Amino acid sequence: ITDGASSDNFQGATASVLAVAPLLCQNRLKSMTDSSGSIAFRPGIGKLVEWLHLRLSENKRQFLIWVLAGLACGLAAVCYHESVVILFGWVRDLAAWAGTGWAVVVLVAAPTLGGLASGLIGTKIEKNAAGGGITQVKARYYLHFGVFRFREAFWRFVASALAVGSGNAMGPEGPTIHICSAVASGIGQMFGLAKRKIQAMVPVGAAAGLSAAFNTPMAALFFVFEELMGEVSSKSIFGILIAVVISAIVERTLVGEHTLFILGLPAFSTSWWMLLCIPIGIVCAAVGTFFVRTILKLRLKARETKAVPLWLRPALSGALIGLIGVTVLNLTGHDGVFSIGYDDLSEVLSGRLLIPAVIALLLVGKFISYILATTAGTSGGIFAPVLFFGGMLGALVGIAGQRLGFGYNEHVVGALALIGMGCMFASVIRCPLTSFMIVFEMTNNYTIMLPLMVGNIVAFLLSVRWHPISLYDSMLLQDGITLKRMPAYQGDQDWHSLPVKAIMTFDVATADASLSA
């Protein structure tokens, strides 16, 4: 993901920080938080904040807060992402050093231990460090005025870095959004903002984190409006824009100007093969709906199962992921099932990997592995796996067209894989504007925008028809959080298409029948 001398130096520095940061932060955790876990900064910082209140007008203070949030979120996102890359690089190096026989042990043990660490942290230390991170952000935003605790961000960083970096088949983007939302909220608390303004800092941090994680500032804006806020206002967009720009500058300064995927695809002129975006959209909608329903059903079954302790489940899923990943690696020579998997996805997108059996094995292995991880409650995100699924599905459709004699080259297959990424994102995440913007910014190829948009619309409409509630909101429902506060479902006209459980109240106040006024 990073290259060049500057990125090598940065990776070395990040490795040093990664080694000592948990110890330093853990020693100071109690001194920086009050009894409830909320931010409680030292008197020196309090005096600085008080001085700024006296010296700066309200507008200038707010501007300073947005700039600080962008800087802090950019640094947090880059450090977290590089930590994941470095940790998985260590796992790869150790497996290569161990040799053929012991490499299997390393590749199975690493995600097992990473899952164990994630499970212990998520059940014994900080329960909000488990899972993907987006649902926790939405719950804090709507139900707690966006007030996060410092320990939530810290333990999310540690748990998900260890889980994803050790090889569990998850992504870093959801945890990045969670960490940066908590960081922005903490800055708002530090400056003594009112609760409504602290709440407004959550989308600021979420957008800044996603911008730095993917190097996609425009997609970050769309995401917070589509998934988190549900509406656009001039006041909110100004702060989000500032933070997104600052975090993007931080990310590009530290890891480089290039896009996430450097593909070398040519500019495409309008051609008949772009009509394949329609079957790709249909396939992604079907697979995405099956994916969402499978996760939700297995989550419910996992809650009913008491035989395996909660803290042990991520370790067991990690062991299974290791076995699946090793099997796929032995059969294909590719390790894309493990961790983020962008290396193999890049090969497919650039047209260097066009063997259907290899692509299918990577797809199935990653699909099963992610479902195991998220059902077990392992700390990690969904964006990277979803993009991986879509890229592989799009490539398979493209290769099928080649085999049928349609006569296009490997670059077209790569373009169809890009379309698949956007379609799967729209199907599962349910953010259609974000879905095509994030693919465009990750690849910087504008010539496939029209088929990408058409495919995304097809995938989005079909997935909504087949499963009306998005994955995130369905998870919140399973957790007993009502959706009536969610902006996407405000207004009677939107409730008509939803099941009763989507708008019912879970926390009902009861009284004994014998009581009197």
Language-model regions, residue ranges each:
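Alpha-helical transmembrane segments and immediately membrane-proximal extracytoplasmic
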Residues: 3, 7-10, 16-17, 22-497, ...
